[in-house]
Amino acid sequence: MTKMSKGPRSGSRRVMTKSVKNKGMPKVNEMMKTFEVGDRAAIVINSAVPDGMPHHDFQGITGVITGMQGSCYILSFKVGNVEKKVIAAPVHLRKVQ
């Protein structure tokens, strides 16, 4: 019997799948979204774009934009008492009011 894969996308079948209507590449507007420091954003992974994709454990988490790193944004949030920072491309982020 073979060993189970332990890659960065393992165990993410439900998170990474899209519905039939949403399949394919995202629109250009979605790729070029802009955020300001202090904006609230949620991580919504778009599996069609592997660049700047955060780990699937962070799917659905909401945090505050604290800065930029290249063309990606740094999103900070707390898990328990631990402050976490995730670097994600704007395609994988959605503004929250």
From Swiss-Prot:
Record key words, sorted: Ribonucleoprotein, Ribosomal protein
GO cellular component term of the entry, any: ribosome
Domain of life the protein comes from: Archaea
Annotated stretches, region: Disordered: 1-23
A single MF term (Gene Ontology): structural constituent of ribosome
NCBIfam families in alphabetical order: PRK04306.1 (NF003303)
Family: Belongs to the eukaryotic ribosomal protein eL21 family.
Protein name in UniProt: Large ribosomal subunit protein eL21
Organism of provenance: Picrophilus torridus (strain ATCC 700027 / DSM 9790 / JCM 10055 / NBRC 100828 / KAW 2/3)
